[in-house]
Amino acid sequence: MNNIIKMLNDEQMKQDVPAFGAGDTVVVQVRVKEGDKERLQAFEGVVIAKRNRGLHSAFTVRKISNGEGVERAFQTHSPLIASIEVKRRGRVRRAKLYYLRDRSGKSARIREKLATK
C-alpha cells in the first residue's frame, strides 16, 4: 500500500522546479481561467516561507502592489503553475520571513547572495 502511494506521488511531482528558498525573488506564472479563455498571470515577489512535503510542498510569495502588501501561497507541484523563475537569490538567516509583514521601505530589503566560485 505504501509503495503504491509513493509511486503515485512521484508520478505527479513536477521535475522542472528550480531550487529556491526563503529570501529569493521569484516570478510564478499561474494559469488563470476566465470564462472559456486561459491565460498566464505573473506573480513576482519574495519567497517568505517554504514547506517541503514531497507532493504537498508549498511556498508563500509576498509582493507590494500599489503600496499594499499582497501574499499568495502556491502548491509547488500544482498543475495551475506553469513555471517558476528565480530572478535573484536573497541572503537571509531565517527559514520563515514573516517579520517582513511588519516592515516597509529600506528595512524590508534583503541582501543579495553573490555567486560563489
From Swiss-Prot:
Pfam family, one: Ribosomal_L19
GO biological process: translation
GO molecular function: structural constituent of ribosome
Domain of life of the source: Bacteria
Keyword match Ribonucleoprotein: yes
UniProt keyword list: Ribonucleoprotein, Ribosomal protein
GO cellular component, one term: cytosolic large ribosomal subunit
UniProt keyword Cell cycle present: no
Function, as annotated: This protein is located at the 30S-50S ribosomal subunit interface and may play a role in the structure and function of the aminoacyl-tRNA binding site.
Matches recorded under PANTHER family: LARGE RIBOSOMAL SUBUNIT PROTEIN BL19M, RIBOSOMAL PROTEIN L19
Family label: Belongs to the bacterial ribosomal protein bL19 family.
HAMAP family named among the record's database cross-references: Ribosomal_bL19 (MF_00402)
NCBIfam families in the record: rplS_bact (TIGR01024)
Full protein name: Large ribosomal subunit protein bL19
